[in-house]
Design a protein with these regions (language model features):
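Short, low-complexity, intrinsically disordered N-terminal peptides in bacterial proteins
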Residues: 1-7, 134, 183-188
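Short active-site segment of divalent metal-dependent hydrolases/proteases
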Residues: 16, 152-153
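Phosphate-handling substructures
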Residues: 29, 69-128, 170
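Domain-level recognition of soluble alpha/beta enzyme cores
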Residues: 164-188
């Protein structure tokens, strides 16, 4: 461990074989490009003391590989899985515009009050992810790499940067992007 405040790296998974809305209910693997871009994101030489990841294969497989290569412990936390898109899992926005345009529009305009059909609400998602985040509780100077999803990282960034939950979908989190959080802090 280093001296100073705890440091968290939030790494979004890379490109997957999935199409459309790929949330908690879509356990799709990375493409070769997805693997390469994640490795490239970590090529800057950061050293991690432990790795925590979502249970979904697009996060878990690279986390296992990176932890083994670095010789650091790995923890899988179900609470770091992506939002559950319910009936929209695996469906593209274009397909939904043909069959469920009104519901999709309501979700995009007001995701807090309009969840995907049979999916998870943003308030439920927030509660789950915040509980997982707070349990990270890194020690002083500890460096923790969290490999997760766009929704999870958007939520942590929204809390950290003061964005309202209603604007969550507008926060840019590209595939295989690394976001540094220093110092770590718990959220409510």
């Amino acid at each position: 461990m280093s001296v100073g405040p705890a440091r968290i790296g939030l790494l979004r998974h890379g490109e997957t074989t999935g199409q459309g809305f790929c949330g908690r209910g879509s356990d799709v693997p990375l493409t070769e490009t997805g693997w390469t871009t994640m490795r490239d994101a970590l090529a800057g030489g950061s050293v991690w003391d432990r790795i925590v990841c979502s249970p979904l294969i697009r996060c878990r497989a690279p986390a296992q590989a990176f932890a083994e290569e670095a010789g650091v412990p790995l923890a899988v936390d179900d609470r770091l899985a992506e939002l559950d898109f319910g009936d929209w899992e695996g469906r593209t926005a274009a397909a939904l515009m043909e069959t469920d345009a009104d519901a999709l529009g309501r979700f995009w305009q007001d995701p807090v009050n309009h969840s995907p059909p049979k999916g998870e609400s943003l308030l439920e998602f927030r509660e789950r992810v915040v509980a997982g985040w707070n349990d990270l509780a890194p020690e002083e100077g500890e460096r923790v790499l969290v490999i997760a999803h766009g929704g999870v990282i958007r939520l942590i960034r929204a809390l950290r940067e003061g964005w309202p939950l209603e604007k969550l979908l507008g926060i840019d989190v590209p595939l295989a992007s690394l976001h540094i959080v220093e110092p770590w802090q718990p959220y409510r």
